[in-house]
Design a protein with these regions (language model features):
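Structural preference for beta-strand elements that scaffold enzyme active sites
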Residues: 139-143, 177-183
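Glycan-processing catalytic domains of CAZymes
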Residues: 179-198
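Short, cationic low-complexity segments
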Residues: 165-177
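N-terminal accessory beta-strand-rich subdomains and adjacent acidic, glycine-rich linkers
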Residues: 1-168
């Protein structure tokens, strides 16, 4: 995580991050579903199991997991507010392919918005040549590497919650478990389990 203590306006042109795992490492990557507008999607896709050196060059959203042998590393974010989420791209260059590097990518800041009346939804019509703006001092998102020796430790890892900003809505006792829409999707990526999924 990084932070700024400037008093005025800050324009963030870009952020650079590259994570080297090794080309033969296996990863689980959820790719964008709209390659022509990769940042405009619903974040709904299955996880593709792939070696890093044969992974698609499409952008993948988080969380993403890499099997490093004795442990798995899941890349996550926390405390993400007024800043674009991090995406990952494999094989951006031959050097990245040889070293098994996942490189960060960020959506550009919207310049002009438009509206789909039939869906009651706005969308980005054009973008700026930077990724974010900010005023005054602030913290930026945490980049998290959750390291687990066993898959069963993944859902119990609470780093995202531990690093998040405190609750801003107050009393949450009114939030109750309930029914969910699209329930037929619940067995999409449960594989290799000893029970019938869904």
């Amino acid at each position: 995580r990084f932070y700024t203590q400037r008093k005025g306006k800050t324009i963030i042109l870009n952020e650079t991050a590259a994570y080297q795992f090794g080309k033969d490492k296996k990863a689980w990557l959820p790719y964008t579903t709209t390659p022509e507008k990769p940042f405009a999607m619903a974040f709904q896709n299955i996880y593709h199991e792939t070696r890093l050196d044969t992974a698609k060059q499409d952008l993948a959203f988080l969380p993403a997991t890499v099997d490093c042998g004795k442990a798995k590393v899941t890349i996550l974010e926390s405390d993400l507010e007024k800043y674009p989420g991090m995406w990952l791209k494999a094989n951006s260059s031959e050097q990245d392919k040889e070293k098994g590097i996942l490189r960060a990518a960020f959506a550009p800041y919207p310049k002009e918005m438009a509206y789909y009346p039939w869906r009651h939804m706005s969308h980005v019509k054009s973008t700026c040549d930077y990724i974010a703006t900010s005023t005054g001092k602030r913290n930026y998102p945490w980049r998290i590497f959750a390291i687990t020796e066993h898959d069963t430790q993944m859902p119990t890892n609470n780093l995202v919650y531990a690093l998040a900003a405190p609750n801003k809505i107050g009393d949450t006792s009114w939030i109750k478990p309930g029914k969910v829409a699209w329930d037929w999707w619940n067995d999409w990526n449960l594989k290799g389990v000893d029970f019938k999924a869904g």
